[in-house]
Amino acid sequence: MRRTFTAEEKASVFELWKNGTGFSEIANILGSKPGTIFTMLRDTGGIKPHERKRAVAHLTLSEREEIRAGLSAKMSIRAIATALNRSPSTISREVQRNRGRRYYKAVDANNRANRMAKRPKPCLLDQNLPLRKLVLEKLEMKWSPEQISGWLRRTKPRQKTLRISPETIYKTLYFRSREALHHLNIQHLRRSHSLRHGRRHTRKGERGTINIVNGTPIHERSRNIDNRRSLGHWEGDLVSGTKNSHIATLVDRKSRYTIILRLRGKDSVSVNQALTDKFLSLPSELRKSLTWDRGMELARHLEFTVSTGVKVYFCDPQSPWQRGTNENTNGLIRQYFPKKTCLAQYTQHELDLVAAQLNNRPRKTLKFKTPKEIIERGVALTD
């Protein structure tokens, strides 16, 4: 027999999912099957729908349970109506539209009433075609809903018809009943899951401690670097792909300007050469410091500093949050180069195009300016 859920049970499904509970565990709690839980969540992308306000004139679940009890006791329709202070015709229609006296079930009848009573508010992007076109264009450029919303507010402040909240974009993508943005456009989001996940995930597989000879610890970094007041202080790391392929990523702490470098290998010679060549091509005001993790790929950090004048600082073991700007940017880069991708197939020109897209995205932390705007303005002021 098909399992039906009360409104309270449905609410608990969404609450458990929001808190990071998996399909199987939710199913065990409610005595259901994981596939049933997934189907319930899928229709709204894991987002809890708004509770519908019931009119006083409509039958409630408790009244429907009284109807079921009365039918089981072989009471007449009129007697049930009198007990509930309802019109006999109301009770009669309720029973007939829900499989009659013999098969009437309160929960099924209540769920059916909820389905039939839905009067969805017209979707904003269904009504506003210019806005929909803009949103779709930016999604295809891999902008986040928050970046799209903030960019519209900053660049088109007087055009009230071109306003949309990030949550409206998310709901239009995830609610399958809304067709203004096809749910397949979820692939353009940073986390392209079919359901929205909670944030309560743990990281696994952190690398062990590696001793860097003569490495300067991050705790000796000056306050001027920590407060992000000047350009030229970078965070860096490697992003790995299949077939032992790697790229190096660099992010300026103040502007969030991103550089992606193609590497011949992960060895310290290859990494040192790529970093040295790149930093020597930058203006002197953008060559101040570099913060890296404790990977052996930067074992030649002293050679790098002598060649470029850039001081290198190393994070504590298993402390990726100490270069959080770079960690966040690597997540953005993974939109373009998912795991199990061979990174060796991409040319430096192709990597530069990806970096250009990231550098032209408005960022909330920059008040929806772009990294390119910030770094170009900063360099111009020092000329």
Curated annotation (Swiss-Prot):
Q: Please, which domain of life does this record's source organism belong to?
A: Bacteria
GO molecular function: any one?
DNA binding
Q: Which Gene3D superfamilies match?
A: Homeodomain-like, Ribonuclease H-like superfamily/Ribonuclease H
Quote the InterPro entries the UniProt record gives.
Answer: Integrase_cat-core (IPR001584), IS30-like_HTH (IPR025246), RNaseH-like_sf (IPR012337), RNaseH_sf (IPR036397), Transposase-Integrase (IPR051917), Transposase_IS30-like (IPR053392), Transposase_IS30_CS (IPR001598)
List UniProt keywords, sorted A-Z.
Answer: DNA recombination, DNA-binding, Transposable element, Transposition
Q: Which GO terms describe its biological process?
A: DNA integration; DNA transposition; transposition
Where does the record place the Integrase catalytic domain? Answer: 213-379
Spell out the PROSITE patterns in the cross-references. Answer: INTEGRASE (PS50994), TRANSPOSASE_IS30 (PS01043)
UniProt-listed Pfam families: HTH_38, rve
Indicate the family of this protein. Answer: Belongs to the transposase IS30 family.
In terms of NCBIfam families, this protein maps to: transpos_IS30
Tell me, in a sentence or two, what this protein's role is.
Answer: Required for the transposition of the insertion element.
Name the UniProt record assigns to this protein: Transposase InsI for insertion sequence element IS30C
User: Which source organism does the UniProt entry give?
Assistant: Escherichia coli (strain K12)
